[in-house]
Design a protein with these regions (language model features):
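Surface-exposed acidic/polar loop and edge beta-strand patches at domain peripheries
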Residues: 1-145, 149, 153-162, 166-187
Length: 187
């Protein structure tokens, strides 16, 4: 049976709450940091850390270059740093903005943590759509899973892409089995 605990990481005057899902039988732990882009910031197996966390980037306001950032509403570089929607230019960096936002905790259960990110006036300055993102992080034995649901809350088509940008510890990759099944669900 999994256990979920909270812990806090403090760096350069910033403090972030983390949720840690552990499976004592499998000797695994999955760490999620909602306020720092809603991302995974740790995965351990037999006490060995597989996710790279760079310091002091954890407490900096710029784009995270560690953990497993969530990429939304764009995974790549937009032309000239802008996306065009209905003929209007919207500024956006590579990988969108979801990894720069604080996410809200939707639910916490024995197998995982669910987070939500909703559109705000600031996100609409960059991306003119009403949306809700739901991400579920689960731990089953030695397997961590991520599932994402994107909801268009508006009445017009909402183009987007999403993905993840994992940073692995190079010395721990010999035991990593990374799979990304192609799944598509349109509602």
């Amino acid at each position: 049976m999994n256990q979920i605990t909270t812990q806090y990481v403090t760096e350069n005057g910033a403090c972030y709450e983390q949720y840690v899902i552990t499976d004592p039988a499998a000797k695994t732990a999955l760490t999620i940091t909602p306020e720092r882009g809603g991302m995974i910031t740790g995965f351990t197996l037999d006490g060995e850390e597989y996710i790279w966390t760079r310091r002091p980037n954890f407490s900096e306001c710029n784009r995270p270059r560690f953990g497993v950032p969530v990429l939304f509403p764009s995974c790549g570089n937009p032309d000239n740093g802008v996306h065009l929607f209905d003929g209007k230019a919207y500024p956006m960096e590579c990988h969108g903005f979801a990894d720069l936002c604080a996410w809200e905790v939707e639910s916490v259960g024995p197998d995982g943590v669910s987070l939500v990110l909703e559109s705000t006036p600031l996100t609409k300055f960059l991306y003119p759509f009403d949306f809700t993102l739901l991400v579920n992080y689960n731990l089953e034995g030695s397997k961590a899973t991520i599932s994402m649901t994107v909801i268009n809350e508006g009445d017009k088509p909402m183009p987007f892409s999403f993905g993840y940008h994992p940073y692995f510890n190079a010395s721990a990759l010999e035991n990593v089995d990374f799979r990304s099944p192609d799944r598509k669900s349109v509602v």
